[in-house]
Amino acid sequence: MASWGGEKRGGAGGSPKPAVYATRKTPSVGSQEDQWYLDYPGDQWSLGFSYSWWKNSVGSESKHGEGALDQLQHDVRLEDLGELHRAARSGDVPGVEHVLAPGDTGVDKRDRKKSIQQLVPEYKEKQTPESLPQNNNPAAPSQAEGGEGGVACGTVEQMTWLCSLPHAVGGGDGDHSSTGAVGGHPRGPGEYCHLHEQRVHHHIFARGKRKGKNHVSNVVR
């Protein structure tokens, strides 16, 4: 069993560093309980250990022990643990990023990112056919899937990549060009559509492809 004393911060910043001592006490010959005690004379913090051995102990008081558990305690450097703890909490200890409180997992909920398996259902729920505007441009040229120059919108990743392509011909601003092409897609004479409608068109094609329907893909030049 180990017990920690509460840390007190009332000491002066320029006060000399108090000494740390640790002793091993065995009350009597044949006792099965050894006690380690670590303390500051300045009463800044204290640390106590109590172990039960399944062997007879030597009835004496010493700073060294016999056996594996005693050796483990002896190898621990008894330094200024109070200042080390305060420095770790303030980020002044190399190699220590964060000191966890009891029950703290160290993971910030704001840093957790959703996987693609979680994002796809949410995206499909938001982008329903009823919520998307209609693309009133039946003359949009298309090719069969897998044809030369065709780009298939089969998955969300492909759809995102396709919609992030430069949607400009000539002018480079995504508006109507002199050739009647909008968003990189050629149009017939007098038939125009906006860049937003082009993206909606891609969304509809991608959603239909996931349902297993045979849709043609838009041509990206």
UniProtKB/Swiss-Prot annotation:
InterPro entries: C144A/B/C. It comes from the Eukaryota. Residues 1-10 have a biased composition (Basic and acidic residues). Residues 129-140 have a biased composition (Polar residues). Residues 1-28, 89-151 are annotated as: Disordered. PANTHER family: COILED-COIL DOMAIN-CONTAINING PROTEIN 144A-RELATED. Belongs to the CCDC144 family. This is Putative coiled-coil domain-containing protein 144 N-terminal-like. It comes from Homo sapiens.
